[in-house]
C-alpha cells in the first residue's frame, strides 16, 4: 500500500482548459479518503498552485518550481533552494544568441521583461500573472529558477550555449517542449520528494508518482511506483522504459489508473478505456 501519491500538473492532471477534470477530482478525493497523502509536484509557482487547489477543492503538500520549494498543506515552507547570485547575474547580463523570452521566479512572483499575454492563458484558473520588470531592479538573491520560452529547436540550441557556459553550475530540463528551465544544481522533483518523504517519516518506496515531462524523470524513477502518462514526451518514455505507461491526460488517465488501484490492486492494469 503506497502512502503518498505525487502528481505533476500540466500534461498529467490539468486538461486542455488548464483545469482538473471532474472524474480526476473524484478519484483524488477517494485516494485521500483512503489515507493516501496527496502531493502536487509541479514547475508552477506556489501562488499559482494555491489558486488552482482552492478552485478545485483540493488540499495537499506542494512541491513547486520543479523542486525549488516544498510546502505543507497550510503553505508553511519545509525546504527550498535558490540559484547562486553570481549565476543569476551571469544569465541576465549575457547576450544569449536566442529570441527566447526569459522568466525569473521568486517567492513574490513571476518576473519577465517581455509582455506576452498568451502566456497567461495557462493561469486563468488561479489568476497568477507575470510582473513586467527591468532586470536590474530585481535582487540577485532569492531567485528560484529561470525559464526560457521559445520553439523547441531554438531552445535546444540555447541549451547547448547554457551548458557550455555554465557546466556544473546549474541543472537544465525541459518542463515542456517550449519551456527550458535553469535550476539550482542538484534540484529536481525527486530530491524534493525525498525531503518531503523524510519529513513525513516515509521513504520514496512508500510513494507513487505520475508525470509526463523530463522535469518528472527523477521523481518517477526513484519512487516505489512511477507512472508515465500516455501523452508523455517521447524522450521520457525512452529514458524510463521500465515504467508503466497509463492513459493520456485528456482522457483523465490518472483517474482511470487510480480507480483500478483503489478497487483492484491485485489485478494487472491496462490503460485501455
From Swiss-Prot:
Its EC number is 3.6.1.-. Catalyzes the hydrolysis of 4-amino-2-methyl-5-hydroxymethylpyrimidine pyrophosphate (HMP-PP) to 4-amino-2-methyl-5-hydroxymethylpyrimidine phosphate (HMP-P). It holds the Pfam family Hydrolase_3. The keyword Cytoplasm does not apply. Belongs to the HAD-like hydrolase superfamily. Cof family. The gene is cof. The lineage of its organism: Bacteria, Pseudomonadati, Pseudomonadota, Gammaproteobacteria, Enterobacterales. This is HMP-PP phosphatase. Its cofactor is Mg(2+). Keywords: Hydrolase, Magnesium, Metal-binding. Mg(2+) binds at residues 8, 10, 212. HAMAP family: HMP_PP_phosphat. The keyword Metal-binding applies. One of its GO terms (molecular function) is 4-amino-5-hydroxymethyl-2-methylpyrimidine diphosphatase activity. The active site is at 8 (nucleophile). PANTHER family: HMP-PP PHOSPHATASE (PTHR47267:SF2), PTHR47267. InterPro entries: Cof, HAD-like_sf, HAD-SF_hydro_IIB, HAD_sf, HMP-PP_phosphatase.
